[in-house]
Amino acid sequence: MALTKIEIAENLVERCGLDKRIAKQFVEDFFEEIRRSLESGEEVKLSGFGNFTVRDKKARPGRNPKTGEDVAVSARRVVVFKAGQKLRERVENAKVKA
């Protein structure tokens, strides 16, 4: 199961005692700020979590895996996330719920 923005807002309501409407708006504003920063080419560093960066990919030749036909893959910008050391350690040491 995936964690959603709604669930994040609900967790803020439970843990911090925020009003539900304020918690939802906080989550939306948080992600909007990350989007704006990435759109303008800025790196987003979240201490203890990881870094989001934007990279420019050059155009390159590719191949359609179904048909084997050669195709051109156009140049594009992509978002890259690199997990921080603390996050990597916590995920590595986490006990998986069955």
Curated annotation (Swiss-Prot):
GO terms for molecular function: DNA binding; structural constituent of chromatin. Keywords: DNA recombination, DNA-binding, Transcription, Transcription regulation, Translation regulation. The keyword Repeat does not apply. Pfam families: Bac_DNA_binding. The keyword Transcription applies. Coiled coil: none annotated. NCBIfam families: himA (TIGR00987), PRK00285.1 (NF001401). HAMAP family: IHF_alpha (MF_00380). Heterodimer of an alpha and a beta chain. This protein is one of the two subunits of integration host factor, a specific DNA-binding protein that functions in genetic recombination as well as in transcriptional and translational control. This is Integration host factor subunit alpha. It comes from Glaesserella parasuis serovar 5 (strain SH0165) (Haemophilus parasuis).
